[in-house]
């Protein structure tokens, strides 16, 4: 095959194909979005609280009574709660901003990859198609679809970490753009805590190897960017820490009620993946992971362009650190970026045997991996995997010996490679979008007062700071979403947080601030420990139990206490 551009078209065609990708992405992320109801009840309750109380909004509290936070940084909740303030609380007002952030993130990744190739010299002819392909890989990775159709922090976090500012900083040797990168990472920290920092090592190395500045200037620029990270993340941490504990909610998931305590806890590393990626299942994220690694290695060995090298280091390093840290939710942009850059760089050099080996190995590994992943599931997936595997195998063989097969169409080879790489994740993504999912028994829809317990909680609700209390944040969130009034989560996130203490709870009851205590609701109330167990024991010993809608309920306003 003759080495040359993948294809070319005018600016109208370029804009049209990009618009087509973004439109298809929007349809994938928005289609029947309300079917999952309130999705994760924990974040939905925080959105509800933030739409009713500005202090709850600022702290990311679970309830408008401002008793306990959701155990994560609040910026993602701010966006959804602000939408709920404008349009009213509903699944659509909460989830549409998430989906739109996903579309924006796909567009930003396209711009990032295209800029690297446009500024990298001889690969300009294929920059659009490579960037489009990388963005498509990102868009149809199942974990991306799950994240952008969900109400967790993943959507905003991924948008903030898309890497465009880093590429501009490398291209221009610009401290301003690098500081902008730091600001985005800092706000990423305020979105998902430590997972936001997985991109930081890659940013540092990319700037050092690619920016047209000396090492002293690079060091000063990186220090300025580090200061930007600290300031953009630290201001909020400082405010929370400086506000006396009695004037703010207990920070859920922390051992001592402080945000610093949460940052130092195991939850700070794992909370992000809770909604969109429950596990490291390969079907969620890993379809093109082997290809991304292979293409990055071979492309780094071939390219002589500083900005291309920096782009590969950025996405490859991001991939490495996020993979080692076990953060699948932030991997798709890195996979898409690495695939887009690697294919463009090696395709331009496919007249060379090493470049053909790299392309062939990437396509072949993807084909084999598609068979392996699809064989783990039932239905038509194994058949689809074998079809993708066969097409990918043929494409890999053709790429390897392509210089001897002059009559073989480059377009046919690319089609086979694309089908091998995208058939599996696209199929999984369509299923992800088509099947409604709700986390932890979330309320499906904006139904207030929809069952017997909800109606009981509504009785005189306006007279109480909390219409009920129960053990654990998720059980409290479900009750709160059903009743439409604040519910106190005893024991914080999982029933083990030391809040409130028994003495504090007794005082709340004496002051008439809590109406009911729910001690049983099937398997939806977690086991209590610490102060929550003491509270539950005290309530059971002092207040008669009654059954309402299958739930064990104690009336704390009962005069017989």
State each model region's role.
Residues 450-451, 499-503:
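Structural motif corresponding to alpha-helix initiation and N-cap regions
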Residues 423-495, 510-538, 543-557:
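Short periplasmic/luminal acceptor-recognition loop of GT-C membrane glycosyltransferases, typified by
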Residues 1-261, 265-358, 365-369, 431, ...:
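Membrane-integral, polyisoprenol-dependent glycosyltransferases
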Residues 559-561:
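Short, charged/polar, Gly/Pro-enriched secondary-structure boundary elements
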Residues 39, 200-201, 501, 528-531, ...:
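Residues at alpha-helix caps and immediate loop-helix transition turns in enzyme cores, especially N-
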Residues 228-229, 251-255, 419-420, 459-460, ...:
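A general structural signal for short secondary-structure junctions and capping/turn motifs
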Residues 350-448:
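Transmembrane helical bundles and short interhelical boundary loops of multi-pass, membrane-embedded
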Residues 117-130, 183, 402-409, 419, ...:
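Intrinsically disordered, low-complexity coil segments
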